[in-house]
C-alpha cells in the first residue's frame, strides 16, 4: 500500500519521534488521535494532524486497526527505518528521487518529470488545481528527502545525495 499525504517536513527527525509518541498505545479513534497530535505538537488544524497520522501509518510508526482506530507501532523511528519506509510506502517518492542527479533541479523541473505519474483520476478530482496540489506534494517529498539524507538542497534546486 502506498500513501499520498505527506506533511511539511519538520526541522529535525526528532519531531517524527514526538509525533509517534503522540499516537496512543491503546487504540483510539481518528478524532482522538488527531486531538492528541494537535494538543501535544501544537498543530494548527485537524487536517494537519490527520496528514501526520496518515504519514505515520505510511512510515510504519502507527497503524489503523480493523475497526478503524489507530495505534502506535513499537518501531523506532531511526533514520534507516524512515528512509526505507519513505521510499517504499510514499506514492511517488522513489520516482521523485530517480529524477535527481548531480545537476540541481527546481521543484518545477522535478514536477515536470513526475507529472505523468500523477494518477489520471487525480486530474478529475481537483480539475482546476491538481497540478498545484501535486507540485506541493513533490515539494514536500523533496524536503523530506533532504531531511532523510536521500537528496541535498543546493543553489538552484535539489540533487541526489552522494551516498544515497
Task: Annotate the PLM regions.
Residues 1-164:
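Donor-sugar nucleotide-binding helix/loop cap in glycosyltransferases
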